[in-house]
Amino acid sequence: MKRVKLIDVLKRRNLSSIPLEIAQYTSSVKSDIPLMESVIEINKAHIVMLTKQGIININDASQILKALDEIHLDINLDPRLEDVHMHVEAYVIGKLGEEVGGKLHVAKSRNDQVATAIRMTLRIQLLGVIQALIELRKVLLTRCEEYLKTVMPGYTHLQHGQPTTVAHHFLAYQGALERDTDRLMETFSRVNLSPMGACAFATTSFNVDRKLVAELLGFNGLIENSIDAVSARDFVVEALAGFALIMTNLSRIGEELILWSTSEFSVVTLPDEYVSTSSIMPQKRNPGVAELLRAKTAHVYSDLIAALTILKALPLSYNFDLQEITPHLWNAYEVTLTSITMATGLLKGLKFDAQRWLQLASEDFSTATEIADMLVREHGIPFRTAYAIVKKLIHKMSSKKKKITDITPEILSAAIMEATGKRVQIDKATLLKALNPIESISAKHVTGGPAPIEILRMKNERVKKIGVDEQWCQTRLLSLKEAKSRLHRLIKKIERGERV
């Protein structure tokens, strides 16, 4: 196909006359590349609307639509044309001449067009991230069932707190990622609104149909105020904040996997493909992917802060500053999506050492709270008194290098006598039950607790929620597909010379 020679349609001069260093400084063509498909679709929908409204004739519309179809095959991005929008118009004019091609831009501006293109591109990205989150949540729920009764010490301040299970811990991850999913779904509803028809910021005196263009592009409605439509980028910040929260949660998962894979913990083996070795120390299994989950979080944070800083104190409506936000959006999206994929593989392939977890949970004093609770339940001792008794006893046991399992009924009775002056007979079986981390966990069948029966209930509820979320995604994708099909049917009618 013969390449169309592009000219600067705004300044009416050859591109060679524009100083390259200035063009490169002001151009957004590199960051516009992800917008190309959306920009072409916008122009097609705009031409269909102009034709329906009688603003341009069917013959001109047909030629323009055919030229738009060829762009992705033939266009060569040049920074001297500023952005992708001018490339599209310059191509159409170069192909058809200004008499016909010059009608492409009637009743629209780059301002409403770029705002629309960003929203169209972002909504697909949001759906992609949501689907990736769903896959990660599925892996967590599958592994919950596998590690339903795998006891581990629960932590606060990285110190042993109370016994729990790996399944309980994984459900906590799942809960955070479920909220991340919900947030992006809510963001989608605010992203999927059309600015088209706002033009530069004051709309147009042409009789355009904003709602038709919105429908043809798959939007759920309009950003009605035309100034707001072209200048708003809060939806970008909202998406970036959602990505940042996802990365925060992934970084926490990554950090725990790093700790757990150390020789000191030695409770998890990470998949071979997700670790690296040393160039000098042959024994090393460095958790490289998990470490990068932590580090790459900083990139997404910086993208969010950059967008907020660019927007700070910007006067309405459009300013060139806004074009500096989109590269941060694309970067944050790529980092977030790939990080979710990496975390999914890590969690799917890792293996826990159940015996080592149980050993850690049994040897330390993680069942101390259960002993205090037992004194309250069985002997009517006020909790704060029971707490003080157990605390003092554990301090004494620790100083003698004793374990919690070394506590006998006689030792506990003596501790109660010392604290209260009362003689209390401790049943051995009841004490052993309180000392046993497995028994401690089984007793905690309160809503949200670690007891296996409660874990299974929560897991099954979350499987249902995943089904709802998958259906939500499919509904949105189908809606976008149907809008695109409708647009293409109308284009075919125009190309056949029929009224729309």
Task: Identify the residue ranges that each predicted region occupies.
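Residue-level "edge-of-site" marker
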Residues: 63-64, 227, 389, 410
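A helix-coil-helix interface module used to build multimeric assemblies
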Residues: 2-203, 208-212, 274-277, 288, ...
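Glycine-rich cofactor/substrate-binding loops
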Residues: 2-42, 281-500
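Charged/polar positions within long, soluble alpha-helices
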Residues: 48, 52, 73-76, 93, ...
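Charged, flexible cofactor/metal-binding loops and thiol motifs
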Residues: 118-119, 126, 130, 145, ...
